[in-house]
């Protein structure tokens, strides 16, 4: 019985080590609320304008990562603090209002946004031989696919 209890304690300590603390959750919530407010206030602005708001949000919640464009990629989250590091995440960003036909949905997975994301991913992996790229995100400011 002591072994099971020790195992549970070890698991709990390990889970606690990776779980965000209450202050981190509060900071994330504050950043997310600020982001949603800015997007709602500027929902008819251009894609570039809204993408800047999204980038600011990402920079607040993802420390020590360089976030910017990379070639034709709307936003790239680099694996390091400079553009010299490899791209780890590709973000295909669409404007909140006015680009609905290009955005993925449950009824339209084969949308322009998805095809662009796949093309950028393949270019990173095949042409640039970037084996560090792990994720792709399609978003229109309010939903993530």
Residue ranges and their predicted role:
Residues 1-135, 142-143:
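A short, conserved, highly charged catalytic patch centered on acidic carboxylates
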